[in-house]
A protein has these predicted regions:
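Bacterial N-terminal signal peptides that target proteins for export
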Residues: 1-8
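Bacterial N-terminal signal peptides
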Residues: 8-17
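Intrinsically disordered, low-complexity regulatory segments
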Residues: 4, 20-22
């Protein structure tokens, strides 16, 4: 039964963006006002910390989104960094139907990067965010990311790193809401065959973003009971 729930949730995540993309192919997409992507700082801090268990997030650096990108509002001491990703953090290349999530201002995806990912992966998401906030479309974002990585302006991905996404208050897209608590594994150049070849919609783990590139992401679910609630302390 639980595997069936996984499949239905994944199919929803896959096909809702695809339907939106097909309906908008006839006209250029426009970004909503930047204010639609922002949150009150206190609320964003609480939501960011809900990405991981308290023993991690209470000691993590917290960054919040402003009109000029992500900025630290709390310096941690364990090397982890927690933020709330927006739709700007959509895949750079594949799956193609996910790329238009940059235009979805409702996305709120709390994530806590481990120390290695905080150094090697977070700058990539920050660059994507800044490019989108300057009005770049998904193709232009991909070009900007590729150019920056080639010039060494983004850290090279040196092996696998990971992040927590355990918040029960995550909203992965309009009409989808929260999904299963899961780990994001940043696995450069991985493709789906390297994690078992699981078909999309089947029980995880499987490749979710940008297979075969430096930015490949493997998603691994954890027990549903490990969800973390965003609560002020």
């Amino acid at each position: 039964m639980r595997n069936k729930v996984f499949s239905l949730a994944l199919l929803a995540v896959l096909f809702v963006p695809a339907a939106r993309a097909q309906s908008s192919q006839s006209q250029p997409r426009k970004y909503p006002p930047i204010q639609d992507y922002l949150m009150p700082q206190t609320s964003e801090i609480v939501l960011a910390k809900s990405a991981a268990p308290a023993n991690i997030s209470d000691r993590a650096t917290i960054k919040v989104l402003t009109t000029s990108g992500f900025h630290a509002v709390h310096d941690g001491d364990n090397g982890f960094v927690c933020i709330v990703m927006r739709g700007f953090s959509a895949p750079t290349y594949t799956p193609a139907q996910f790329r238009d999530l940059v235009y979805d201002s409702s996305v709120r995806a709390p994530i806590c990067f481990d120390p290695k990912a905080a150094k090697e992966v977070l700058p990539y998401y920050e660059l994507r965010t800044n490019l989108a906030m300057h009005g770049k479309n998904p193709d232009e974002i991909a070009e900007g990311v590729q150019a920056a990585y080639g010039r060494g302006e983004l850290p090279k991905r040196e092996g696998v790193s990971f992040a927590y996404m355990w918040s029960v208050d995550q909203n992965l897209a309009s009409g989808i809401g929260h999904w299963h608590p899961h780990m994001m594994v940043f696995a450069p150049y991985y493709d789906n065959s390297m994690v078992g070849g699981t078909s999309f919609g089947a029980p995880l783990p499987q490749l979710s973003d940008d297979a075969g590139t430096p930015f490949a992401v493997v998603v691994i679910p954890v027990d549903h009971n490990l969800f973390v609630k965003a609560e002020a302390k």
